[in-house]
Amino acid sequence: MYSPHFDGLDLDGDGVGDGGHVWGLDGPQGSADTLVLSFENRSASISPDCLGAGTAKTLHRVDSRFFVSGGRLMCRGSSNAATPQPVAESLEDFQVRYALRLGSGDLATLQWLDADQMAGQWPQVLAVQVCLQMVGVVGAVGGPRLEGPSFQGCNGLDQAHEGRRHIVLRNTFVLRGLGRVR
């Protein structure tokens, strides 16, 4: 439960926090997405932002904005909002999907949506699925010769490796301590 001091993200663009804890933006033509997470700061010592920096106790909301720039996953945190920092290198893609619960009780199911399908539903997000597609350097030494389509990218399509190793990392993060999400 949030305290009355937590105003959350401004989900409707009116300059006033709407209590939201997650927001996203789909990248144009399938390019990398943007993800913003927000939570209530209850203690300066245990509420770091995405850069690992503590926040002032007077700051009631901690925001972390993730986006891709120049092949790096960047983070703009509350501790230094003016200067985003890289948190991962060699990134080819960053895709995010959001889970909403449909129905209730034992018949409840999840619907996974992209950011552009989420209008008016941000406060109901239960989980976030993040996919990072990373790539090695061209002509790296070692390992077997790479031939043919070698991996399935974040977009779900088979992609040629183009002589480089790729890794696709996908994880689902449950929000608000709601238990398991499938």
Model-derived features: where do they sit?
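Short, low-complexity, Pro/Ser/Thr/Gly-rich segments in the mature regions of secreted, periplasmic
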Residues: 173-182
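Short amphipathic
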Residues: 168-171
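N-terminal pilin/flagellin-like segments and related low-complexity appendage regions
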Residues: 1-124, 129-131, 137-166, 181-182
